[in-house]
Amino acid sequence: EEMKIQAMKINTWGKNVYVKVPVANSKGKFMGKIIKELNNKNIKLNITAVYNAKQTEKILKLINKKTKVIISIFAGRAGDTGKDPVPEFSKSINLAKRYKNVEILWASVREPYNYLQAKQLGCHIITVPPAIIEKIENFGKSFDQLTKETVKAFLVDSKKSNFKI
């Protein structure tokens, strides 16, 4: 009930505001009731802490096809467990194609290559931290160029430690 009250208040902040709701509570219980209720009140939602296409499918079964919804799938955290998030994104994006009001967000970026993965899959949104954006600027460099830059960095490090290369 408290989440509903907060969501209603946040929704008054502006037309471009999305209310963030976790897909499940801290006990792992699916938050379908509140998702459906807020969606039916035309409150834009960012449903977060999603990890798989089954969760995406459960969300899609509840929502209408007019109120905007973002489904945030945590790719980096999934990858941290040794699981490839790409198949779950691919399935989720395909499921969401029937809903013009739904966007899939690639959350929890860990490396620049995630940007390319999200782009290749047709992900609608990707949240990229500044440190990763800086690394994306390396895209297009040749391996020979990277070798030269790496060895130059080794040279700088060796001079700092009074060693010679």
Explain the meaning of each model-derived region:
Residues 29, 41-134, 140-161:
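Catalytic alpha/beta core domains of metabolic enzymes, predominantly
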